[in-house]
Curated annotation (Swiss-Prot):
Homotetramer. Keywords: ATP-binding, Carbohydrate metabolism, Glycogen biosynthesis, Glycogen metabolism, Nucleotide-binding, Nucleotidyltransferase, Transferase. Belongs to the bacterial/plant glucose-1-phosphate adenylyltransferase family. This is Glucose-1-phosphate adenylyltransferase.
Length: 418
């Protein structure tokens, strides 16, 4: 599928990305950065997917609201997303919490993160607002969602997908009628309702919403004046529209961008160490579920100027090679072996090392004869020579962050304590 050329609706819309979340279930991986700024896929950040979807859909006005530990994210956005040009009626605004409405508070909920920047949005006068979460990995044509919103004369259109019922308690869950009008909406229920006829599945919100701008700000002004509101889209705004307006569900399967090799609608919340590791390692398969080589729907990002990846030494026991792996620019694999692993920019793997199922973030240095299995290594970590991880669960859990499913997170403070 090629990016939208129609632009009729996308050009009248503004994409507003909520990128202030911490992502606490990623533990130490988000200590220095917000979840949307976490590295993914070898050279991108998680937020690049929502932003690329907006660009590829034809949207040319974008705002990004930041809050938690935003420096890494803001620096990435400044370097990689500064190509929008006002003279072409384009804009890209980074919107950190700046107490524009109240002098005593930062963003107090997702709805407040939009409300506080109402004057900036009003200057651009978009007809529609596409509210996006900045911490999910997927490819989607928002133009198609905008079309449904207009065609069904909706007050809000909510992006939805089917998820296993046992996993749905982390989402907004809804019931819809035969025309996909939302009848009930529950935010993160303890016992999520199943889909009629398929009780093992629930219809879950993707955190993607389309509103007509004037109507959205009517809702936001009323919400801001409500002292009992949590100022959250899922908890307050969407349930209000379900009760008093027309809320429509937009099924992700109808607007998911698939390449020829993709058969299923791909969407991931990489919010746990296991989910993050699995989504990255899946990219090393022959036919991954997510196609990053799709030239028709590119994932835009900031790309550092680096030398090509380099593999050196070719002798028995000291042969630099990789199998079923992704190796980014600036990496040097020196007499070591990689299998089903992913190296981000500038990683150095010294001789006699063995990596299996390793997700290694930028500028990591892996010492000689290290053995790493099923690991996530944070940016800039220096792995000492001879370190073995992934072979002794008890030792791994004592020294590092080990998940119940066996993924081991390694950060520099953990190494320093060895």
């Amino acid at each position: 599928m090629t990016p939208s050329n129609r632009g009729t609706l996308a050009r009248t819309a503004m994409a507003y990305v909520l990128a202030g979340g911490r992502g606490s279930r990623l533990y130490e991986l988000t200590d220095p950065r917000a979840k949307p700024a976490v590295y993914f896929g070898g050279k991108t950040r998680i937020i690049d997917f929502a932003l690329s979807n907006a660009i590829n859909s034809g949207i040319r006005r974008i705002g990004v609201a930041t809050q938690y530990k935003a420096h890494s994210l803001i620096r990435h956005l400044q370097r990689g997303w500064n190509f929008m040009r006002p003279e072409r009626n384009e804009s890209f605004d980074i919107l950190p919490a700046s107490q524009r409405v109240s002098e005593t508070q930062w963003y107090d909920g997702t709805a407040d993160a939009v409300y506080q920047n109402g004057d900036i949005i009003a200057d651009y006068a978009p007809e529609y607002m596409v509210i996006l979460a900045g911490d999910h990995v997927y490819k989607m044509d928002y133009e198609l969602m905008l079309q449904q919103h207009v065609n069904q004369n909706a007050d809000v259109t909510v992006g939805v997908l089917e998820v296993p019922q046992r996993e749905a308690s982390g989402f907004g869950v809804m019931h819809v009628d035969a025309n996909d009008r939302i009848i009930t909406f529950l935010e993160k229920p303890d016992d999520p309702p199943g889909i009629p006829g398929a009780p093992h599945l629930s219809l879950a919100s993707m955190g993607i919403y389309v509103f007509r701008t004037t109507y959205l700000f009517e809702l936001l002004r009323a919400d801001a004046a409500d002292p009992h509101s949590s100022h959250d889209f899922g908890k307050d705004i969407i349930p209000t529209v379900v009760r008093h307006g027309k809320a429509i569900a937009h099924r992700f399967s109808t607007s998911c961008v698939r390449s020829q090799d993709e058969s299923l609608a791909y969407w991931r919340d990489v919010g746990t160490i296991d989910a993050y590791w699995e989504a990255n390692i899946d990219l090393t398969t022959v036919t991954p579920q997510l196609d990053l080589f799709d030239k028709d729907w590119p994932i835009w990002t900031y790309s550092e100027l680096t030398a090509p990846a380099k593999f050196v030494h070719n002798e028995e026991g000291r042969r630099g090679h990789a199998l079923n792996s992704l190796v980014s620019g600036g990496c040097i694999v020196s007499g070591s072996y990689l299998h089903k692993s992913l190296l981000f920019t500038g990683v150095r793997v010294h001789s006699y090392s063995h990596l299996e199922g390793a997700v290694v973030q930028p500028y990591v240095d892996i010492g000689r004869a290290a053995r790493l299995r099923n690991v996530v290594v944070d940016r800039g970590v220096r792995i000492p020579a001879g370190l073995v991880v992934g072979e002794d669960p008890v030792l791994d859990a004592r020294r590092f962050r080990r998940s119940a499913r066996g993924t081991v997170l390694i950060t520099q403070p953990m190494i320093d304590r060895l």
